[in-house]
Regions:
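Extended acidic/polar, glycine-enriched regions
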Residues: 129-137, 224-284
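Substrate-binding clefts and catalytic carboxylate motifs of secreted carbohydrate-active enzymes
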Residues: 18-21, 27-35, 40, 184, ...
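Intrinsically disordered, low-complexity Pro/Gly/Ser/Thr-rich segments with frequent PxxP/GP/PP motifs
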Residues: 227-241, 668-716, 784-811
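Aromatic-lined substrate-binding rim segments of carbohydrate-active enzymes
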Residues: 125, 132, 335-381, 439, ...
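Active-site-adjacent substrate/metal-binding segments within catalytic domains
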Residues: 52-97, 101-117, 179, 205-206, ...
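Accessory beta-strand-rich segments of carbohydrate-active enzymes
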Residues: 12-13, 17-20, 24-33, 45-53, ...
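Active-site neighborhood of glycoside hydrolase catalytic domains
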Residues: 355, 371-464, 623
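Terminal connector regions
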Residues: 242, 260-266, 701-753, 805-828
Length: 828
């Protein structure tokens, strides 16, 4: 039986509360009054200065350094407002700040009414008796976050709380762990340092006689009793349709209207679903499982990690969020992890995830650091967590809370060179913050979801070890993060056979059309100051080229701009191939237990999106353009996948299915193609095999040497293996896939394919013709927003037709004029 429990907590103002919005035009001034201008609230200082022409685009070239002074200054916001007499006569008046970034002192009519020190929480200040008949003056003095963090760090004299500063390559600010602010705003290895200041969410005056509703929340309970309490009400529904993740069923959302006599009513969406994080013994394994069960069904999570969409949150639009989430869904993703170094996303993000069936792994905003545990810090964190859980727990898309990103691992593997004698002190602080406070609040506020203290973690095994495991990366338990940039990513045996891969990935550069918006032509060289400046990951550019060079000949055009464009292309090829190999390994490991490891039930590659135009691990560029990786994700996250590997000289092909009940009868079709001909050298077809529902099944195994001998006229270097799954009747049921038998850099017979297009026809179809087989065929239309139905593909026929879906009005002529076509053999 399904019920929903409604909780009323004394906000949603309506009939019983008079609201005066204070959003709109304010005045903004810096500390010495040398800068004074009109500002929009919600907003931030950087955006205001740019809109008023005081500065240019902060993302342009080296402006992140040139505009550092903005974050080092203090700023004052001022507004005037009047209150109607009939409103002023009510009993109570409260000023509500939904979000201040970050440290501020607020005064009304010259009287200090409160202070803020946390950008992640709402502040309410009672101003009854302070309102005037005439104009009221409201001022918000915002202190430099950099200065505040430094002062708090230096005041913490008993022991250090590392890290002090980010690596020099990040060009960032220090002591971000001492301020409750987006940790990445002081810099990260994929983004700039812009420690923003401002009133980043709405401001309003609420006037009322008695009380007001602060929030409505709902939770799903399974109970046969109907109980009515003073503060909540259980409502029984005889029959409801469940909410399912994308690819597993419909996302049923119900309109729920709540009428409160005091204040009127409100209508919002509710849904019904259950979630469990299953950690239980596995036969033939010394560890525990780690997987999500939604509505009683095990679900393999397929997705990525989400970082802030923009350094300046006031510039994040609904369209930007929608494009990214739709892109995730189009890539067959059913999950995203909101990473703990950014922000709790805005309401529209979670509402869209509810609609699209995208499950959310929600971190709390602590990342890659240790944190202080003074009383005032703990107090503001407790309020932050309480507010965020109450705000988000009604969303069916949110399926798990996680206390932090990598902080258990930071202590366990000694990131910060803490002495053995001092370690217990830091473990105590860790337990105090994440277990005794954050976990305690979450369990009180929301009993319907699992809570993990950290990621990666060994889950219940970490708990047994006092919350900090000896090895939080142990693949027998919990989730893992894994990065290795110098090992050959084509060697799938090097990847951990983990229960759940919540972070992994490789860098690439975004397209030239994306970079050109923030650079000049002299920057378009991998050895330029711009290329070095934009790379915030130590040795990142070298790692990309070294990894690419293992399997590809690097571009050698004598035209510097063309060489730059080609090098960008080769980094995207490398990234797509590396992540594909790793992801397919995880997907076909879901049914395996080998040496106690396996039963992988989730892959969230790092990362979905970008915060600016620069090199990163993303599959979608800043602005929404898909990298090659994202196109490939649509295939390696397909509901039914054929995945091939070479193991001990054998070609193994697995059939992987996300289905819960249907066993698919499939044939595996394998073709060997020569690089010098469109005709298959030979073809093989397996007998009909059943793919296990919700599992992985070996559907084809053959000695590669025997296969080459059997086919004749093929060597590892001269041929490629293409394969797919079909029904017994021959219908395609998995994406086409392929496996190289040697590195493409050693390919024999691979020629320049001379790809041409016949122009764009109605509905934006592009027909391609080539003279020889081509690999990694890439179509780019520069700045025209949209995406192709396939891209970065293997072209084994003389003709191929691709569809472009535009995100804005365009013409065939515009697309044709901007179309660039590249294949691997074209870059050397």
């Amino acid at each position: 039986m399904c019920f929903t429990k409604l909780f009323l907590a004394l906000k949603r103002p309506s009939l019983g509360v008079d609201i005066i919005s204070l959003n709109g035009k304010w005045q903004l001034m810096n500390s010495n009054s040398s800068v004074s201008l009109s500002a929009e609230v919600p907003g931030c200082v950087h955006t205001t200065l740019q809109r008023q022409g005081f500065i240019s685009d902060p993302y342009y070239r080296f402006n992140d350094l040139a505009y550092r002074w903005i974050s080092l200054d203090n700023w004052t916001y001022t507004t005037l407002f009047s209150v109607p007499t009939h409103v002023r006569g009510k009993g109570k008046a409260v000023l509500v700040f939904e979000g201040v970034d970050t440290v501020s002192t607020i005064s009304l009519n010259g009287v200090t009414i409160g202070k803020t020190d946390n950008m992640f929480r709402r502040y309410d200040f009672e101003v009854t008796g302070l309102l005037k008949d005439e104009e009221n003056v409201l001022q918000v003095w915002v202190m430099s976050a950099v200065t505040y963090a430094s002062q708090r760090s230096h005041a913490h004299t008993e022991y250090r709380v590392p890290p002090d500063c980010p690596p020099p390559v990040q060009k960032g600010e220090c002591h971000v762990n001492f301020i409750r602010k987006a940790q990445s705003s002081f810099s990260w290895d994929w983004g700039p340092s812009f420690p923003t200041l401002g009133i980043w969410k709405g401001v309003r005056l609420e006037v009322f006689n008695t009380s007001r509703v602060l929030s409505y929340t709902t939770i799903l309970v399974n109970n046969n009793n109907l109980d009515i309490y003073d503060d909540n009400k259980c409502v029984h529904f005889k029959s409801v349709s469940l909410w399912w993740p994308f690819g597993h069923g419909e996302q049923f959302l119900y309109y729920l209207t709540i009428d409160v006599n005091l204040e009127g009513g409100e209508t919002f969406n509710v849904a019904f679903r259950t979630v469990e994080l299953v950690q239980e013994p596995i036969p033939s394994s010394p560890g525990l499982s780690f997987y999500f069960r939604i509505n009683g069904k095990p679900i393999f999570l397929k997705g990525s990690n989400w970082i802030p969409v923009h350094a300046f949150q006031d510039q994040v639009t609904t369209d930007m969020i929608t494009i990214l989430l739709r892109s995730a869904q189009k890539a067959n993703m059913n999950a995203l992890r909101v990473w703990g170094g950014g922000v709790y996303e805005q309401d529209i993000f979670y509402s869209l995830c509810d609609m699209y069936g995208i499950m959310i792994w929600q971190d709390f905003m602590f990342a890659c650091a240790l944190y202080p545990t003074e009383k005032d810090f703990i107090q503001t964190v407790r309020e932050e967590v309480t507010q965020q859980v109450r705000r988000l727990k009604s969303h069916p898309s949110v399926v798990i809370w996680s206390g932090n990103n990598e902080n258990e691992a930071a202590i366990a593997t000694d990131w910060f060179n803490i002495s053995v004698a001092a370690r217990p002190l830091y473990v105590k602080d860790y337990v105090n913050l994440y277990v005794e406070n954050i976990r305690d609040i979450v369990l009180q506020e929301d009993s319907t979801r699992p809570f993990l203290v950290s990621s990666p973690t060994n889950g219940v095994e970490s708990e047994k070890e006092g919350w900090v495991a000896k090895d939080p990366y142990d693949p027998h338990y919990g989730d893992t993060h894994y990065y290795s940039y110098y090992k050959d990513c084509w060697d799938w045996t090097a990847f951990p056979r983990t229960r759940f891969a919540s972070e992994y990935g490789f860098q690439s550069w975004p397209s030239l059309s994306t970079l050109s918006k923030v650079s000049v032509s002299s920057d378009w060289d991998f050895s330029s100051n711009f290329s070095a400046h934009r790379q915030h990951h130590e040795d990142g550019n070298q790692q990309m080229l070294k990894q690419a060079e293992l399997h590809y000949i690097l571009p050698n055009s004598t035209d510097p701009v063309q060489k730059y464009r080609d090098t960008i292309y080769i980094t995207q090829v490398m990234q797509a191939q590396c992540v594909k190999i790793q992801t397919e390994f995880y997907r076909h490991s879901r049914s395996d237990i080998i040496e106690g490891k396996g039963h992988t039930m989730g892959t969230l590659y790092w990362q979905l999106n970008d915060i600016w135009q620069g090199p990163s691990w993303s599959s979608v560029e800043f602005g929404g353009k898909w990298k090659m990786l994202h196109y490939w994700a649509t295939d390696f996250y397909a509901p039914i996948l054929s995945a091939g590997v070479e193991d001990k000289g054998d070609l193994l092909i697995y059939g992987v299915s996300d289905s819960h009940s249907e066993k698919h009868n499939v044939k595996t079709k394998v073709r060997l193609h020569s690089w010098s001909s469109f005709n298959a050298v030979c073809s093989l077809e397996s007998n009909v095999t059943k793919i296990k529902a919700g599992g992985s099944t070996l559907v084809f195994q053959h000695s590669i040497s025997a296969l080459l001998t059997q086919c004749g006229n093929c060597t590892r270097r001269s041929c490629i293996v293409a394969f797919h799954l079909s029904s017994p009747e021959g219908q395609l049921i998995s994406p086409h896939n392929h496996i190289f038998l040697s590195s493409p850099r050693y390919a024999e017979g691979l020629q320049k394919p001379n790809i041409t297009d016949t122009g764009i026809v109605q509905n934006f179809f592009v027909t391609l013709h080539c003279s020889f087989p081509a690999v990694y065929v890439w179509l780019d239309v520069d700045n025209i927003p949209g995406h192709f139905d396939v891209n970065g593909f293997l072209m084994l026929s003389k003709k191929s037709t691709v569809l472009f879906g535009a995100w804005r009005p365009t013409t065939a002529e515009e697309i044709t004029a901007n179309l660039h076509i590249t294949s691997l053999r074209d870059v050397y």
